[in-house]
Amino acid sequence: MPDFQFEKNLVLNYLKELDKADPESVAEVINKYASPNFHLRCVHPFNDLIGAEKIASNFWTTIKKSFMPLQRRMDIFYAGSNLIDNHETRWVTNMGHLLGLFQEPFLGIPATQKAAFLRYAEFYRIENEKIVEGAFFLDIMNFMQQLGLSIIPESTGVVGITPGPMTHDGLKFEKQPEQEGIDTLNLIIRMAKRLVGAGLQTTKSDLELDWTEDMLWWGPGGIGASYTQKGYLKGHTRPFEDNLDFVSFPGHILENAEGNIGGWFGWPSLLMKAKGNYMGLTSTSDKIAEMRVVDLYRRSGNKLSENWIFIDHLHFLKGLGVDLLDRYKKLKSPE
């Protein structure tokens, strides 16, 4: 039976020190736990970063200077081998919110001096007792909607603080039964193959094969959450499918599971074109844009009950010609 306890403890220790570090000490912490060429994929506008100094100065320093003190509120934590490379590599995943006092401007957005929740999901590959590769998805659009910024139209789902699993069993700090993880991975792969095979077109009968009736779809900023199969079709599937054309599925970088939790991320996961007014921000275009996506799932028996989704919407929309950060800065400019 595979044992991922070393990898889990390494990442937990890394996160503990990282969270406590002041902006000037972040690079030192990263160097302690990561390889010299540690590659971290971050959402736009941070994007691909390599090495402790760049990761610290370009990403973590920005976060920590704007939101301090920073508190990690983790809802999902698990580890597993990667199906994509025939289970050769070992990865650790965690998801939750970073809570901080919004004290200084962030990406041109003025500080509120109030508490702010930064929804996140992150992934780390461990090799030779070091973190060598990872991804950090920060839901910046969700944060912008928390602040009520008018540049983002009303979502078709509910936007707010995203809870963890209803069963409160998302933190897999201890070793889990191997078969449980296998069952979870098999189910989410079956569901995904059906969805991609249908060109991302979903029907009620499709949902009934893989999902509980009272499913919870915790969508990203810009879309929001949906409850029940009927609510999911109305709040996400129909607006998504009606306004975007599926071009191709480049594949995922990671697919794994442990216990009743599993998921993946891609860089990108999908290539899409706008064929309508997606989120009230796009128009029909021949531009092909990259959609970087995270999906994490909770399995209940032989069906999926919950799904947490992150989309790097700032990157995707920019590929379609809509730069939300630039638009916001221009709207707030005195000239």
Predicted region positions:
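C-terminal and inter-domain tail/linker signature
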Residues: 1-335
